[in-house]
UniProtKB/Swiss-Prot annotation:
GO terms for molecular function: lipid binding; proton-transporting ATP synthase activity, rotational mechanism. It is found in: Cell inner membrane. Belongs to the ATPase C chain family. It is a multi-pass membrane protein. This is ATP synthase subunit c 2. Keywords: ATP synthesis, Cell inner membrane, Cell membrane, CF(0), Hydrogen ion transport, Ion transport, Lipid-binding, Membrane, Transmembrane, Transmembrane helix, Transport. The keyword Membrane applies.
Length: 91
C-alpha cells in the first residue's frame, strides 16, 4: 500500500474515531440535561446554559480531529520524504 493510501486510510479512521467519541459524549450530555430539567424545571435556564458550554467543548474535539485529518491529507510533513523514497525505489 502506498504512502498516500495510508494517509487517506489514517485520516478516515481518525475522523471516524473522533466523531464517534464526540457523538456519544454529546448524546450523554443532552440526556443528562433533559433529566435535570425534568426533575427541576425551574433551573432549566442554568442547566441549558451549562449544557451548551459543555457541548461546545465536546464539539471542539471533533474539530481538532478534523484539523489533524486535513493536515495528514493536505499538509503532510512527510510527503517530501515519501516522494524521494519512492523515486529512489523506482530507479
Amino acid at each position: 500500500m502506498s504512502f498516500f493510501s495510508m494517509c487517506v486510510l489514517g485520516a478516515a479512521i481518525g475522523m471516524a474515531i473522533g466523531t464517534l467519541g464526540t457523538g456519544i459524549g454529546q448524546g450523554l450530555a443532552v440526556k443528562s440535561a433533559v433529566e435535570g430539567v425534568s426533575r427541576n424545571p425551574g433551573a432549566s435556564g442554568k442547566i441549558m446554559t451549562t449544557m451548551m458550554i459543555g457541548l461546545a467543548m465536546i464539539e471542539s474535539l471533533a474539530i481538532y480531529a478534523l484539523v489533524i485529518c486535513l493536515i495528514i491529507l493536505f499538509a503532510n510533513p512527510y510527503k517530501d520524504i515519501a516522494l524521494k523514497l519512492a523515486e529512489t525505489v523506482a530507479k
